[in-house]
């Protein structure tokens, strides 16, 4: 989801690898071990949770998480919890990374010390406040000065133990006085609207009886302050919980009679600092945060056109897309946006065919074909992930789920056998699993996506043409991707391919490792099977599969998925599971009488229908055909005082649903919008609030059939497999070119050197593939010019934004140190440019 700003869209995403924790404090009991899990939070909102690792003080998680971030945030936080069967799970510690600091840890493993968690560490939110100093004449005719402190509202207050009933205290404090006032308690909201005014006498009336203007003494101004404290009203015996505070020196009114601003809440000055960070252990993380500022499409035309014609450039090494792979530090970094862009415009097959053919021509040994981490390999990997994910799920998921649920021991290493286990029984169980997975893979050829088949056909042709004497190379060229880089990794780590929600337990992980090794060897068609294994027990196990029928099945499968002109006979009309999970829904009012309460239900979306049931596997309680979905929109929080709600609008009624967090809500809205995009009766307007108590809360219309009062949001492309924003991917590629501008210029130098010097290649230029220096130089010149033009647009946007930025506004509250640094940096840039 993009945050709309003037003239551009802002996209945020984060990719996280949660590695492990170490040296957690021991449990205060005889066992001393803990059952721990880790959560990922945007500020305080949990968006992901790892599995529970039992009985460990150094738990290994090994889990990956990716999400598009649909809202603004200040901190990306990680909490380590200790599970408690009888009470609320307790927090051991947390890691909080400020949004502005995320780039410091970009894409590298980092150990973070766990910090203590208390009320002060959990402070978040902002307050809108106005101070006004006025002159008042008393009943006796004496002139005095009154301070009016108006607290309008708060936003984003922390939720304590699942609830937030906030109130504020406003205190005028000085060395010899402290006068406090209190607002009303606002129930069940962390965005309270107070709009209350409190009056304080600033000076003694006699002090100003002869003055007609504001001229109170310097020492009075410097020593007085307004303090606002936010509290959560609690019925617990421990008292109300602290939510945050702010302090405003009264000298802000020295030059004006009123002052109004937004403030970030801060922890108390005397907050708890008794626990040393080292006492709580540490957590290993790898975080990749990306923020893209995307202009309208016409800005990207020159660079986009240059990239899209890459397949037609001779030689392909002189193309803009190939050059991107040459200058990026990591080939995958280039492949991800490149493949998405080319897929979006239907140019991925010609480009991959061209770079694959060029790579094959440089390969000397058919046994090493496509075995390196080249741009070709990374582009094909990314294409298979994008286009083949549904194919992978249909093929493997049922068997993988059964393996995870059965918990059968399949250990065949005699050294690792547990007491009471039988080697022959384990070997037979493993053989059955391998046979089943091998069978479903080799029979799935007709379901392989067309774009993958077209790529495999080009690989097969290029390899057969290059190594005409090797009859097996046409198979190994394809199997090196479909088996070694697609099926085998998915079996080994199913959580990375969304086949399982979390990393599997150690025993299941071991079973999947053994299956993956065997499938990889079967698919490789290597001539010496036993030599493929370092372990003798694997060589012994493989004797079960040392029959010609297995090799024939692999070849038939590879022939089918790499045949010229083959098309997927399976129509998109077949039911495809797109998304499922628990959410909370409000009764739709299908019954004339009765309470419209909220209940937890298991939701399931296919390309045919949207259903919900009590639990996974139960019969559906409600079926909504896709053609009956007229719109999918967010529901305003004020409707039910519940966050992350959206509505699925049908001809007769709307289904109100609450997702578990903002990320999940965005995912459901996006996919539901996508599958219903082509419905002919889609609405153009809707009601953003609910119909309650005889009227719509948004427009106050009394009829429940009243036409909507707000335009529907823009839809997404109606493409079930891929949802790609071409402009966003071009912006990502621009960012990479801009980041590696030094390498682009170095590559230009290499082209010049090669054009005029025929001797041995200089070492600093040897890392570049330059087949045609003149053509490569021309492309580089165009790339640098296109990147420069876009950089000017970004610089102009930053200047315009800086001019309009007001410190203390709702978007940029006072108290944000990172924003103060931004102001200072932009001021320096502006001064330098002048």
From Swiss-Prot:
Function: Inhibitory regulator of the Ras-cyclic AMP pathway. Binds inositol tetrakisphosphate (IP4).
Lineage: Eukaryota, Metazoa, Chordata, Craniata, Vertebrata
Alphabetical list of InterPro entries matching this protein: C2_dom (IPR000008), C2_domain_sf (IPR035892), PH-like_dom_sf (IPR011993), PH_domain (IPR001849), Ras_GTPase (IPR039360), RASA3_PH (IPR037774), RasGAP_CS (IPR023152), RasGAP_dom (IPR001936)
Biological process, per Gene Ontology: cellular response to heat; intracellular signal transduction; negative regulation of Ras protein signal transduction; platelet activation
Gene Ontology MF terms in the entry: calcium channel regulator activity; GTPase activator activity; zinc ion binding
The keyword Metal-binding is assigned to this record: yes
Entry-linked Gene3D superfamilies: C2 domain (2.60.40.150), GTPase Activation - p120gap, domain 1 (1.10.506.10), Pleckstrin-homology domain (PH domain)/Phosphotyrosine-binding domain (PTB) (2.30.29.30)
Name of the protein in question: Ras GTPase-activating protein 3
Any one annotated GO CC term: cytoplasmic side of plasma membrane
Zinc finger intervals, Btk-type: 679-715
Residues of the C2 domain: 1-112, 123-263
PANTHER family per record: RAS GTPASE-ACTIVATING PROTEIN 3, RAS GTPASE-ACTIVATING PROTEINS
Domain Ras-GAP span(s) in chain numbering: 346-561
Phosphoserine PTM sites in chain numbering: 77, 809, 833
Site (Arginine finger) location in chain: 371
Keywords of this entry: Acetylation, GTPase activation, Metal-binding, Phosphoprotein, Repeat, Zinc, Zinc-finger
Residues with PTM Phosphothreonine: 110
Superkingdom: Eukaryota
N-acetylalanine PTM sites in chain numbering: 2
Pfam families: BTK, C2, PH, RasGAP
Positions bearing Phosphotyrosine: 66
Organism: Rattus norvegicus (Rat)
């Amino acid at each position: 989801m993009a945050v709309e700003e003037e003239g551009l869209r802002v996209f945020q995403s984060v990719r996280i690898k949660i590695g492990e924790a170490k040296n957690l404090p021991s449990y205060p009991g005889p066992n001393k071990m803990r059952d721990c899990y880790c959560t990922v939070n945007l500020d305080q909102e949990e968006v992901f949770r790892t599995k529970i690792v039992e009985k460990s003080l150094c738990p290994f998680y090994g889990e990956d998480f990716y999400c598009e971030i649909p809202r603004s945030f200040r901190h990306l936080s990680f909490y380590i919890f200790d599970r408690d069967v009888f009470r609320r799970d307790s927090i051991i510690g947390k890691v909080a990374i400020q949004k502005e600091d995320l780039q410091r840890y970009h894409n590298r493993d980092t150990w973070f010390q766990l910090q203590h968690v208390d009320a002060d560490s959990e402070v978040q939110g902002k307050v809108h406040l106005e101070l006004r100093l006025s002159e008042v004449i008393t009943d006796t005719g004496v002139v005095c000065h009154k301070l009016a402190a108006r607290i309008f509202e708060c936003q984003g207050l922390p939720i304590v133990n699942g609830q937030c009933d906030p109130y504020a205290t406003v205190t005028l404090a000085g060395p010899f006085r402290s006068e406090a006032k209190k607002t009303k308690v606002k129930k069940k909201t962390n965005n309270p609207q107070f709009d209350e005014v409190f009056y304080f006498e600033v000076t003694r009336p006699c002090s100003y009886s002869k003055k007609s203007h504001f001229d109170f003494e310097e020492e009075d101004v410097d020593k007085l302050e307004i303090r606002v404290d936010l509290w959560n009203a609690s019925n617990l015996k421990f008292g109300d919980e602290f939510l945050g505070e702010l302090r405003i020196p009264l000298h802000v009114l020295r030059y004006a009679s009123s002052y109004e601003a937004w403030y970030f809440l801060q922890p108390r000055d005397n907050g708890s600092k008794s626990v040393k960070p080292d006492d709580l252990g540490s957590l290993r993380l790898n975080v990749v945060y990306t923020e893209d500022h995307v202009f309208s499409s016409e800005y990207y035309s020159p660079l986009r056109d240059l990239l899209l014609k890459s397949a037609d450039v001779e030689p392909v090494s002189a193309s803009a897309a190939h050059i991107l792979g040459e200058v990026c530090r990591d080939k995958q970094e280039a492949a991800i946006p490149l493949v998405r862009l080319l897929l979006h415009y239907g140019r991925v097959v010609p480009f991959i065919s061209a770079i694959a053919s060029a790579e094959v021509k440089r390969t000397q040994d058919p046994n090493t074909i496509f075995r390196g981490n080249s741009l070709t390999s990374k582009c094909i990997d990314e294409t298979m992930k994008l286009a083949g994910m549904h194919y992978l799920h249909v093929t493997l998921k049922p068997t993988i789920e059964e393996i995870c649920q059965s918990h059968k021991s399949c250990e065949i290493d005699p050294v690792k056998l547990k007491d009471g286990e039988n080697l022959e029984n384990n070997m037979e169980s493993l053989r059955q699993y391998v046979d089943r997975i091998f069978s479903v893979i080799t029979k799935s050829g007709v379901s392989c996506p067309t774009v993958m088949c077209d790529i495999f056909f080009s690989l097969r042709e290029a390899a057969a043409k290059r190594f005409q004497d090797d009859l097996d190379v046409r198979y190994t060229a394809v199997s090196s991707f479909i088996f070694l880089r697609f099926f085998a990794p998915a079996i080994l780590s199913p959580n990375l391919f969304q086949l399982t929600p979390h990393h599997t337990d150690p025993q299941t992980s071991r079973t999947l490792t053994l299956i993956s090794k065997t499938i990889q060897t079967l698919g490789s068609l290597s001539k010496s099977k036993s030599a493929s294994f370092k372990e003798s027990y694997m060589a012994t196990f493989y004797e079960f599969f040392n029959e010609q029928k297995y090799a024939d099945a692999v070849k038939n499968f590879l022939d089918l998925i790499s045949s010229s002109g083959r098309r997927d006979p399976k129509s998109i009309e077949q039911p495809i599971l797109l998304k499922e999970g628990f959410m909370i829904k409000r009764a739709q009012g299908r019954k004339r009488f009765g309470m419209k309460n909220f209940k937890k239900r298991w939701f399931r979306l296919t390309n045919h229908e949207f259903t919900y049931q009590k639990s996974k596997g139960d019969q559906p309680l409600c079926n909504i055909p896709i053609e009956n979905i007229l719109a999918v929109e967010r529901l305003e929080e004020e409707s039910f005082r519940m966050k992350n709600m959206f509505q699925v609008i049908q001809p007769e009624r709307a289904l109100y649903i609450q997702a578990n967090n903002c990320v999940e809500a965005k995912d459901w809205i996006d996919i539901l919008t996508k599958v219903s995009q082509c419905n002919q009766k889609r609405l153009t307007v809707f009601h953003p609030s609910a119909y309650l108590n005889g009227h719509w809360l948004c427009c106050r219309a009394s009829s429940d059939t009243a036409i909507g009062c707000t335009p529907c949001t823009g839809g997404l492309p109606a493409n079930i497999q891929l949802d790609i924003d071409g402009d966003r991917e071009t912006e990502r590629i621009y960012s990479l070119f801009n980041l590696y501008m030094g390498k682009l210029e170095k590559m230009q130098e290499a082209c010049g050197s090669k054009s005029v010097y025929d001797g041995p290649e200089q070492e600093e230029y040897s890392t570049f593939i330059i087949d045609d220096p003149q053509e490569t130089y021309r492309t580089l010149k165009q790339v640098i010019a296109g990147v420069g033009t876009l950089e000017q647009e970004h610089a102009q946007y930053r200047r315009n934004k800086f001019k309009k930025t007001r410190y203390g506004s709702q978007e940029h509250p006072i108290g944000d140190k990172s924003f103060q640094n931004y102001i200072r940096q932009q001021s320096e840039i502006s001064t330098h440019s002048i």
